[in-house]
């Protein structure tokens, strides 16, 4: 891909913070710009937690304790999408051992014991009714009060939470769960999507101007809103803010992520579909 640093005359790179620029930087070259940032986030129906006399969960033990209270009504404290279940298990192993699944170079470095710990953690979540199996995840369960929470990407927040909000439930953003004696956070963030320019383009200036319009342009920002996530570009954010278009559960989740210092940059290899499928099939 084209090094976008070489096209900074046409692209306002100053609209992006260092983390946003790092997503598309490889070996010092800026290959892509993000539209927004994403991470697994826990959304809770505070109305239901209040009814059960429970505080919102801060750690895995809180979720287990909530399950003890809710299971007599066949209610789960939280439901997880497949990706959320997988990344929660990855987070748990890192929190307990301090070891990451991937090295800085992207090499798999879990031991066999780490893999067993990862699978055992998720099995415990299932056995103790903290969450229903990810392969049975139902987006309608939150509004039906069959679950008191959902864990998913920020970009999917409105899809899962808005129906419950329309029923009058107070849906709030929860903490990123941890082990009570965690030695590491274990949670990651990534770009929602990215734009890049082919290295062999015959029209780099025109392509750069188009890219700038897509990520920084006021007109594009207003047309797109938060369709590709809360904008990573400060220019696009300002355009939305000026028109009171920054609101809702997705924006609140994005604000929590932006203000968190515990989230690391996710390697694309952490989302390897083969590893995810193996995790799910083994858990089944």
Predicted segments — roles?
Residues 40-44, 195-197:
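Short glycine- and hydrophobic/aromatic-rich loop-to-beta-strand nucleating segment
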Residues 69, 107-135:
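Glycine-centered hinge/linker elements that transmit conformational signals in sensory
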Residues 158-167, 180-281:
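C-terminal lobe and pocket-closing loops
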Residues 23-35, 40, 64-108, 123, ...:
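Extracytoplasmic/periplasmic solute-binding protein
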Residues 48-49, 65-69, 138-150, 154:
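Short helices/loops that flank or line small-molecule/ion binding pockets
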Residues 47-57, 128, 200-207:
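Short helix-loop capping/hinge motifs at secondary-structure junctions, enriched
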Residues 1-40, 55, 64, 94, ...:
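Hinge/lid segment of periplasmic solute-binding proteins
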Residues 29-30, 71-77, 128-130, 145-149, ...:
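Loop/turn elements at helix/coil->beta-strand transitions in domains of secreted/extracellular proteins
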């Amino acid at each position: 891909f084209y090094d976008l640093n070489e096209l900074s005359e046409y692209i306002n790179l100053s609209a992006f913070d260092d983390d946003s620029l790092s997503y598309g930087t490889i070996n010092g070259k800026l290959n892509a710009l993000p539209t927004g940032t994403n991470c697994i986030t826990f959304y809770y129906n505070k109305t239901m937690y209040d009814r059960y006399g429970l505080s919102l969960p801060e750690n895995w033990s809180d979720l287990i304790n909530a399950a003890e209270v809710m299971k007599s009504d066949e209610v789960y404290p939280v439901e997880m999408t497949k990706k959320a279940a997988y990344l929660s298990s990855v987070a748990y192993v890192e929190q307990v051992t301090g070891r990451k699944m991937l090295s800085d170079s992207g090499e798999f470095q879990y031991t066999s014991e780490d893999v067993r710990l990862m699978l055992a953690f998720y099995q415990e979540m299932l056995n103790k009714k903290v969450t229903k199996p990810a392969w049975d995840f139902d987006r309608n369960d939150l509004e039906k009060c069959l679950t008191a929470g959902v864990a998913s990407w920020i970009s999917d927040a409105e899809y899962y939470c808005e129906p419950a909000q329309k029923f009058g439930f107070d849906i709030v953003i929860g903490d990123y769960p941890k082990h009570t004696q965690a030695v590491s956070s274990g949670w990651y963030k990534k770009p929602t999507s990215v734009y890049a320019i082919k290295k062999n383009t015959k029209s780099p200036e025109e392509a750069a101007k188009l890219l700038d319009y897509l990520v920084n342009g006021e007109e594009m920002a207003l047309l797109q809103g938060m369709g590709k996530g809360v904008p990573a570009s400060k220019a696009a954010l300002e355009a939305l803010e000026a028109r009171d278009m920054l609101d809702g559960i997705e924006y609140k989740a994005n604000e929590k992520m932006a203000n968190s210092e515990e989230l690391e940059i996710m390697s694309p290899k952490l989302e390897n579909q083969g590893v995810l499928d193996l995790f799910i099939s083994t858990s089944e």
